[in-house]
């Protein structure tokens, strides 16, 4: 089974740059009703930022996490 066959018919995969702020990622998650975004470097996947990563950041750093770049909170 290929990845393409698994995600076929699902919501589009959203990617952001490593410089994207968590604040913008939260907006994308809400807007697209998704739980994670890929962190991209051109066409290469560098990591993923999930709701869980953001929740952990909020617990550890409070609201300051919202102004943190994706590269600093992503799982890779």
Predicted regions and their residues:
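The conserved cystathionine-beta-synthase
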Residues: 15-33, 40, 58, 71
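Short active-site oxyanion
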Residues: 12-14, 44-45
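Tandem CBS (Bateman) regulatory domains
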Residues: 1-12, 26, 50-76
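A glycine-centered beta-loop-beta connector
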Residues: 29-32, 37-53
């Amino acid at each position: 089974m290929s990845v393409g066959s698994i995600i076929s018919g699902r919501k589009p995969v959203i990617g952001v740059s490593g410089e994207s702020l968590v604040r913008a990622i939260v907006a994308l998650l809400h807007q697209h009703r998704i739980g994670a975004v890929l962190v991209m470097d051109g066409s290469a996947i560098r990591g993923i930022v999930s709701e869980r990563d953001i929740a952990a950041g909020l617990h550890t750093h409070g609201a300051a996490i919202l102004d943190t770049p994706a590269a600093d909170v992503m799982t890779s």
